[in-house]
Amino acid sequence: MENEEWKVSVWICQEEKLVSGLTRRTTCADVVRVLLADHNEKQAEEGSMLMGEEGSMLLGPPQCYCIVEKWRGFERILPNKTKILRLWTAWGEEQDNVKFVLVRSEASLPNIGPRSAEAKVVLSKESPCHQRTLSKTSTGPTQDKQRRVVRKAFRKLAKINRKRHETLPKESSSVEKMETLVHLVLSQDHTIRQQVQRIMELDREIERFEARTHFDRMKMHGVNYVQETYLVGTVSEKGSASDSNPPSDQSSQEELFADYAQKCDEVLLLQEQISRQEEAMEQMTVQIQEELNKRWMERRQEELSSKEQESSLSDSGADQGGDESQLLLEQEQVKTELSASLYIGLRLNTDLEAIKADLDYTQKMWDDKEQELQSLLHSLNDLETSGCQDLAEISCEDTSLGVTTTGSPTDSWVEKDLGRPTNCEANDEDSDTGLSSMHSQDSDSGPVCESLV
């Protein structure tokens, strides 16, 4: 136990006394005996002659006295066998409102109820022996009632303490639940943000993979591999044409495709740079606006201060050329405003020139890349037309061999020579018009047959 639990204050003759050294077995009778002995010793040591009023209060054996418990206007008599330390600890937080008073048993009220004043000692005029007999006869039947009251009070105090201990865990549990909910919401928010970021990263990876596979298929099957896969009738012809293409054309096409992919990447980088430049321009405009607002506020404050100075100067020196001083102040104010506006204008002009230079540079780079892309596209179209010409020549050779089996070899070579310029002219026309490879093949087949006939 703590030191506070070992001490109990008891009021005796309107004087508070602390009774220390209490144990669990200490009863109210023990406390009464100790208080009477201490009081009588003090009275004997002082040797006072005024024993009539105060000294007569504590005359008699300890059985004639009892301890009354008072709490918020209520009081009750504690039996002699009551464990005072247990009762004191059972009060708990209400110990500040509890007070123990030592009185004579005859002076205390037998019933328990609210009292406005403290118990006063009433001196009896009869003999002490008669008082003892009366006290024995009067207190005999009320001891059981007092015990029941004390037990009931202990039960009530136990219930109060139990309820208090139950409410505290409930409050703590509700607070813990709220904290767990808050932590759960925060963790879910964090996981959702991570999942959104991961989804964006996966989308970018998917786009890159699709672009890579597209370029790989273009390298392997050609630019029009989609048309070749869906046009079933020309699949065999395309396969034979791809087998007849020389390896040099394939290598050149692969190089062109690689250049094309590189240029596309550079274009994307340029677009990113342009977006960054636009963001920088927006930031610069915001900074310029803030600077203008700041300068305007400073100028406004200067104007207000100058007006105050002018008013003070006009009040002090109204008789000594007030008009001239006002003119001078206005001139200085105009000069400061002009210098500030000039500085701001120069600053804005330099910033705008720098931004224009950056924009011109990016536009120039964009035009160069676009020209390179156009040239690459033209070269790809030329390669397609040349491949179609090779296919047409191979088909012409096959047909000439099949038709002129009875003729001489010189005639077949002559027919081939006659058929070649017509094919070149037709291919030139198709390349000039910019038609696709499929249309160029259709246009090549007609003149070859006419020359053979």
Swiss-Prot record:
Cited SUPFAM superfamilies: Ubiquitin-like
Assigned GO CC terms: centrosome; cytosol; spindle pole
Family annotation (InterPro entries): N-RASSF (IPR033593), RA_dom (IPR000159), RASSF10_RA (IPR033634), RASSF8/10_RA (IPR048945), Ubiquitin-like_domsf (IPR029071)
Biased composition regions of type Polar residues, renumbered to the chain: 402-411, 433-444
Tree of life domain: Eukaryota
Composition-biased stretches (Basic and acidic residues): 299-310
Gene3D superfamilies, per database record: Phosphatidylinositol 3-kinase Catalytic Subunit, Chain A, domain 1
Domain called Ras-associating: residue spans: 1-107
Principal localisation: cytoplasm
Keywords tagged on the record: Coiled coil, Cytoplasm, Cytoskeleton, Neurogenesis
BP GO terms, sorted: nervous system development; positive regulation of neural precursor cell proliferation; positive regulation of neurogenesis; signal transduction
Location in the cell: Cytoplasm, Cytosol; Cytoplasm, Cytoskeleton, Microtubule organizing center, Centrosome; Cytoplasm, Cytoskeleton, Spindle pole
Residue numbers spanned by region Disordered: 299-322, 402-453
A Pfam family this chain is assigned to: RASSF8-10_RA
Chain segments annotated as coiled-coil in the UniProt record: 262-295
Function, as annotated: May play role in regulating embryonic neurogenesis.
Protein name (record): Ras association domain-containing protein 10
